[in-house]
Amino acid sequence: MLYPEQNEARLKLSLDGTWAFALGSCVEDQFDPAKPLPDAQPIAVPASYNDQNDQTTALRRHYGWAWYQRKVTLSTFCAGQRVVLRFGSVTHTANVWLNGKLIAQHKGGFTPFEADVTALLHPGETALLTVACDNRVNHSTLPVGNEDGQLAFFGSDNAGIPSVEAAKRAAAPQNRPNFDFFNYAGIHRPVVLYTTPKEYIEDVTVVPAVDGTVQYAVKTTGSAPVRVTVLDADGNAVASAEGAEGAITIPEVHLWEPRPGTPYLYTLHITCGADVYDQSFGVRSIEVRGTQVLLNGKPLYFKGFCKHEDFTAHGRGFDPVLNVKDVNLIHWANANAVRTSHYPYAEEFYDLCDREGILVMDETPAVGIGGGAAVNPYKEYPLAEHHRQVLAEMIQRDKNHPCVVLWSLGNEPDLEHFPQDAYDYWHPLYELAHQLDPQDRPVTLVCCQNDYTKDITTRTMDIVCINRYYGWYNLSGDMDAACYGLNQELDFWAEQHKPVMMSEYGADTVAGLHTAGAEMFSEEFQVEFYRRLDAEFDKRPWFVGEFVWNFADYDTVQGPMRVDGNKKGLFTRDRRPKLGMHFLRQRWAEIPTFGFKE
């Protein structure tokens, strides 16, 4: 599925703005999609609906379907064209109707979907567009939610007390996310109508090599001849070819590299009959060789942030202003990488990372697969088919981005209690990712802090990615013990002869809280936490990177472990740096992107 663009052959019409909105229930067909919503209120699109009306807690605590509606008029300029309705994402399950006719259904809240509406939406006519989205998470969704009778992530309970058990039985149904971020929902990313000619370019795949050879494949719906031209960054034609697939050689090729290098971008300009499409790409290689990760043949060190799509008022909604600000803060911090924890981000963010030279670890929404020794998720959770779907959709969407250098299959599953079942679940996904990616990028799985000696899955990934909280959740506040424990584990990973990196580590830090002795939750402790652990990373030549948790404070489910959200951000939620960020900024300024451990 190509990203919609406007050019001489295609028209793109935004449907973003203020829509009509109504909360539903758990009944999927509660409202008639062919009629105006009853008692509708205004809602902004794209954005989460949860925090847009503080006059009531109903939106914040909603459980079930929510309904959106607006009128759509197609311009007469679109006459004779194919017309497509596209959603960047709707969280988590979506049904879409046009004039009461069901035109699309999609499960998965972080990837795009679309419907051909040429036969239903005619130029000069107005139609009623209705969208219903279901925010419920359970054992069949990604991310995973807990079922009735179970706790939310970091929830608390005095199980067995009669009054507590009675209150639980009497309580209204609610989401119990098995993940540590707020379950925002709604139409989160842009909604557009776009047109193409009747015969059109359907898909483009670009596989560049550092010698300047570019393999390409163009999928079309008709028989018109295909012509491709490579344009340099100034728009000059440097190579061309005929045919729907083949190879082009770029003379004196410029490579794409992360900042402070040059993230040089080319454009593959494609014509097919009346249709035209431009696909940007960068020429770079990424591979694992021994215990090193090589980008363009040079040993790479990741200096990165884990992030969330999260901000006040619009929740997880697409925000181009915030994306630009965050990218500039990443540059300011002297970082070079982002992990899209814990789901694929908006497509426009990857475009920015391509342009600005920021490396991306691209992650599926597979978080929360595990519940301790009592539950075997690989036998009891019906997830495998949906997991394959979201993995395939992510790779298909992001395959041409030079910024994407690593696929993450998921976050912190249970790999300890049912090790063989875990391997049997995850290894086929690892193989599938390699099969689906035409550039064959490295593939990983981010593992949590459990008994790593029983984990037989992580060690089989291309890069070992470990989430560890020595000094915070384990050996809390004792950084001497934390460093000892970390080194005990790193000795184990050294024996696996793989590149290893810390994909998540951090300490909750209340902005403005200061202590003389670097006590937990203070800004001083955040500095000490990173200073001590980072020094241990630097001693290991096979340790290839660090992704701090988190870029900024973010919202979570209520619970006794969270006071107004997760405070592990190096920036506050409104993007003010804490002391720990100033420490990391200096550290990362002294670490080169290439050749740090040679």
Segments predicted by a language model, with ranges:
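The substrate-binding groove and active-site-proximal loops of carbohydrate-active enzymes
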Residues: 109, 176, 180, 308-321, ...
